[in-house]
């Protein structure tokens, strides 16, 4: 039995701070380790599409390649252009890195496995993602070079354009779930894949008309997430054939590494958000009442594995898009966001709102 004095210590502000710091550290370590192997998988998939082997020298099957790259970046010299604003130049990648990891504070990995279970989790995520553009703009401006500056301007326009559509899509999920708490959104989709919001959410046969709305919304959300994170085929802010490396042209060593880690953390975050909002989060595709007899920790690991498998699946789609889809022109990118996704998502918000007011759920 736990000592009452120890129990009372963890209830104090100091104990709570230590517990929260431990949770944050555990989540950061999991994200960094996941990124190391997901980045390797990304390179392997790209190589496989091109009929190459990919990284296969460092460690068995190349599994340690990402760790070798980490050491390479950390041990290199930090080169700062002579005309750059040194303070802003070094602050920009730190902001991007910090915001990318701060967003994970509200992501539920399993029942109860969340650093901060706030009731406005979706609003928090939307705010954090909106702030991410500042690091890119600061990096492009502080470099005092035309290519980084053009890349940062492209990134700002691109992120703002697609955030509007993402916001409307999130509203449709909020209307169906009746909550902005991410754990409650996942909990409302338990009971089988037919209760996931991509299929209209819980409600039996009465919710079948919602399929015509929610399936396209899930697809648009995922595509908009690619544009939001500057991933191919929407990697115009760092298009090699036009801008060399975009806003990252003048960066090297650790600052470049921070930008890259922040970018991939955001990519995995989009995969996690797609999983949570439309594909049931940590819930299994089929009812899993047998976990009721399990120990809480074992059940949590079971649900966490489902969450992680779904995230890996969407990351695979991201990697395949990079390998097989050609890059959009800038005018095509803007047209897709403003003339296709935005009007469609706005109409879908109106349809979901009407369903909530006049549909079977309202009549019940």
Curated annotation (Swiss-Prot):
Localization terms from the record: Cell inner membrane
InterPro entries (UniProt xref): NADH_UbQ_OxRdtase_su1/FPO, NADH_UbQ_OxRdtase_su1_CS
Main location: membrane
Entry keywords, A to Z: Cell inner membrane, Cell membrane, Membrane, NAD, Quinone, Translocase, Transmembrane, Transmembrane helix, Ubiquinone
Transmembrane region(s): 21-41, 88-108, 120-140, 159-179, 208-228, 267-287, 301-321, 340-360
Annotated catalysed reactions: a quinone + NADH + 5 H(+)(in) = a quinol + NAD(+) + 4 H(+)(out)
A Gene Ontology cellular-component term: plasma membrane
A GO MF term: NADH dehydrogenase activity
EC code: 7.1.1.-
Topology relative to the membrane: Multi-pass membrane protein
An annotated GO BP: aerobic respiration
HAMAP family named in the record: NDH1_NuoH
Subunit structure as annotated in this protein's UniProt entry: NDH-1 is composed of 14 different subunits. Subunits NuoA, H, J, K, L, M, N constitute the membrane sector of the complex.
Family classification: Belongs to the complex I subunit 1 family.
Family matches, as PANTHER family: NADH DEHYDROGENASE SUBUNIT 1, NADH-UBIQUINONE OXIDOREDUCTASE CHAIN 1
Role according to the record: NDH-1 shuttles electrons from NADH, via FMN and iron-sulfur (Fe-S) centers, to quinones in the respiratory chain. The immediate electron acceptor for the enzyme in this species is believed to be ubiquinone. Couples the redox reaction to proton translocation (for every two electrons transferred, four hydrogen ions are translocated across the cytoplasmic membrane), and thus conserves the redox energy in a proton gradient. This subunit may bind ubiquinone.
Protein name: NADH-quinone oxidoreductase subunit H
Species the sequence originates in: Phenylobacterium zucineum (strain HLK1)
Gene: nuoH
